[in-house]
């Protein structure tokens, strides 16, 4: 199955670079791999080496959550291949809710389902700070002290890190002297964990967790992190000083600690943001653009005002030596960036396209926009969508998942009440009973999911009708099976998902495909959907129509492509910004209060506008024309 990674284009030349230089900006050395699977495989081998060398009992500490799951799979594979045995291993988990809930809502459910159930570990060698009922203060204190004594001095501790720097349930302000204890969970923790429960009211408010001092007693510590969502915290604990508001930073004091991260989690580290400050680089045209844009941000100047002194003072002497003089670099990068701007995302007919991002022919083009959820198309590239339709292209939009779990029960009842008032039948009480039958931690009833899916389909069709698209012939609701679990945890992507996409692509045979270029959660819906499309394309290799097909990547509501990577920038007029906003409004079930809003309190239309307006501002500051907003894309191939 295809894995989504962006092709490399220039960067730090690490071959032969001394380790001390490579990690020169890092307080915790970072081992960076292409994706979470590659990092987990290497880490699993390191763990296996430690276990196999140990003559006695090997004591391994593991964190909860989703970050260790790829590691579990790699360890299970090594076990099945006979390269590791857990018969002499003790496993210590760093936390659990107090009192411990049912197994399917336990903090350690993935540990059991993905690791312990598949290896030869002795049940008595699994240590979890788990109490099934509330005890008196003296008893629970004794339990914590006993667990802490056993968990002190672990051979190895492997932990994922939360986006706010929490490790386990050690949140901002936790003492570096803390030991295993009962913890009253703050609202932020409960909100974060509520996705595994019916609502925040059902989410536990207490836990038992290992303290920072206990963690620091381990002989060796490995931190792990995957996806762009973790990039900011990875930068903080890797390069920034200790900060009590980021508990993971206390681990910088450990003498034997390092991190295993993927390229997306490492994206904000200096050796990725400004690798010329670390060592020699490969200077490709896009990488030169990246460096010049970075330099403009440092000195607060447009491209054509940069001086030789600016380059030299900011570590870009090698660039001058290989590609100077500076005036030539400035002009080349200015022209390169200016040529990304095009108001014709499908190509301008009968025009010189030698410097345009999209060829003029064929015209019109057949286009497929893949939208992971039923609103990602208008949120992420609504302005470009408008232009493609209005400029006469045959545009199709494919909604990959139903998005049904992201609809509040109250929204369903409101729609049923409206249907009753309009005389289309009375199912209000029936649906109310279905909602009342829901059980915390269990999948939603299929009948309810079907209603929620119908609501989102109607909203999506309404939005694209406002662009002039025929919602009967050019809207495709794929309902990929991996998504239809009825809960937050989705199924694995399978060939059944791929086949649905292949059928659509063969039907349309597009010249352009637009995909969500999401680099965040490796197992999130956006990433899974994009990888499903790429796998479908891979299986279609050899089809004649693919020779003239190009794939363009857009970003979501929160993040944007850095200008060093951009291949096409589509400017939006003030009227197009308003038209896009009104299309987002059509998604009423997502407009104000949604079940899983994340940390950003802004509505989707606000996020989308601020993101595209900020991109326009960056182009303006670099010396380009000033636009109301700009949507940018990266060309995958």
Q: Language-model segments: which ranges?
A:
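Glycine-rich anion-binding loop/nest that anchors nucleotide
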Residues: 158-160, 196, 201-238, 245, ...
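Active-site beta-strand->loop->alpha-helix modules in alpha/beta enzyme cores, enriched
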Residues: 134, 297-374, 378-547, 553, ...
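N-terminal glycine-/serine-/threonine-rich phosphate-binding loop
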Residues: 1-59, 352-354, 361
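Ligand-binding beta-strand-loop-alpha-helix segment within the catalytic cores
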Residues: 7-27, 84-158
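ATP/nucleoside-binding phosphotransfer catalytic cores, i.e., glycine-rich phosphate-binding loops
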Residues: 2-7, 22, 219-315
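Glycine-rich N-terminal segment of FAD-binding domains in flavoprotein oxidoreductases
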Residues: 53-81
């Amino acid at each position: 199955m295809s894995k989504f990674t962006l092709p490399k284009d220039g960067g730090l030349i690490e071959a032969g670079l001394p380790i001390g230089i490579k990690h020169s900006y890092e307080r915790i050395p970072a081992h960076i791999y292409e994706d979470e699977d590659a990092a987990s495989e290497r880490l699993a081998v390191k763990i296996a080496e430690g276990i196999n060398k140990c003559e006695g009992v090997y004591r391994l500490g593991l964190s909860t959550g989703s970050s260790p799951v790829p590691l579990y799979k790699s360890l299970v594979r090594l076990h099945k291949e006979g390269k590791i045995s857990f018969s002499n291993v003790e496993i210590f988990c760093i936390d659990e809710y107090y009192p411990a809930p049912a197994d399917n809502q336990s903090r350690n459910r993935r540990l059991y389902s993905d690791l312990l159930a598949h290896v030869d570990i002795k049940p008595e060698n699994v240590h979890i700070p788990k109490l099934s009922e509330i005890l008196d203060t003296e008893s629970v204190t004794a339990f914590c002290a006993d667990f802490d004594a056993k968990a002190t001095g672990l051979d190895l501790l492997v932990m994922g890190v939360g986006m706010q720097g929490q490790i386990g349930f050690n949140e901002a302000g936790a003492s570096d002297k803390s030991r295993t204890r009962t913890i009253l969970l703050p609202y932020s923790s409960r909100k974060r964990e509520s996705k595994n429960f019916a609502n925040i009211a059902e989410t536990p408010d207490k836990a038992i967790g290992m303290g920072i001092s206990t963690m620091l007693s381990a002989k060796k510590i490995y931190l792990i992190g995957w996806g762009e969502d973790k990039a900011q915290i990875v930068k903080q604990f890797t390069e920034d000083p200790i900060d009590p508001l980021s508990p993971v930073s206390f681990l910088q004091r450990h003498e034997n600690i390092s991190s295993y991260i993927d390229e997306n989690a490492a994206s904000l580290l200096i050796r990725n943001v400004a690798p010329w400050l670390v060592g020699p680089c490969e200077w490709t045209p896009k990488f030169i653009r990246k460096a010049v844009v970075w330099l403009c941000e440092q000195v607060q100047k447009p491209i054509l005002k940069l001086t030789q002194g600016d380059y030299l003072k900011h570590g870009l002497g090698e660039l001058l030596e290989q590609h100077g003089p500076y005036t030539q670099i400035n002009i080349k990068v200015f022209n390169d960036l200016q040529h990304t701007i095009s108001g014709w995302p499908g190509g301008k007919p009968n025009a010189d396209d030698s410097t345009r991002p999209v060829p003029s022919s064929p015209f019109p083009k057949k286009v497929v926009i893949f939208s992971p959820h039923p609103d990602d198309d208008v949120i992420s590239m609504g302005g470009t969508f408008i232009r493609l339709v209005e400029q006469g292209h045959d545009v199709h939009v494919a909604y990959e998942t139903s998005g049904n779990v992201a609809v509040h029960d109250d929204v369903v009842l409101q729609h049923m009440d409206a249907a009753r008032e309009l005389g289309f039948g009375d199912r209000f009480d029936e649906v109310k009973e279905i909602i009342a039958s829901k059980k915390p931690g269990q999948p939603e009833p299929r009948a309810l999911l079907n209603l929620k899916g119908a609501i989102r389909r109607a909203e999506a069709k309404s939005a694209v009708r406002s662009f002039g698209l025929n919602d009967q012939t050019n809207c495709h609701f794929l309902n990929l099976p991996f998504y239809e679990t009825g809960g937050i945890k989705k199924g694995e992507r399978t060939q059944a998902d791929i086949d649905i996409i292949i059928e659509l692509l063969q039907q349309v045979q597009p010249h352009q495909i637009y995909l969500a270029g999401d680099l965040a959660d490796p197992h999130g819906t956006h990433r899974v959907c994009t990888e499903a499309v790429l796998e479908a394309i891979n299986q279609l290799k050899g089809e004649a129509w693919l020779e003239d097909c190009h794939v363009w990547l857009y970003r979501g509501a929160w993040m944007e492509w850095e200008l060093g990577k951009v291949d096409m920038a589509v400017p939006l007029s003030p009227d197009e910004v308003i038209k896009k906003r009104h299309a987002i409004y059509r998604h009423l079930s997502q407009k104000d209060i949604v079940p899983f809003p994340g940390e950003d309190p802004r509505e989707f239309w606000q996020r989308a506008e601020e993101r595209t307006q900020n991109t326009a501002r960056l182009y303006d500051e670099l010396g380009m024309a000033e636009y109301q907003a700009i949507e940018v894309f990266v060309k995958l191939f």
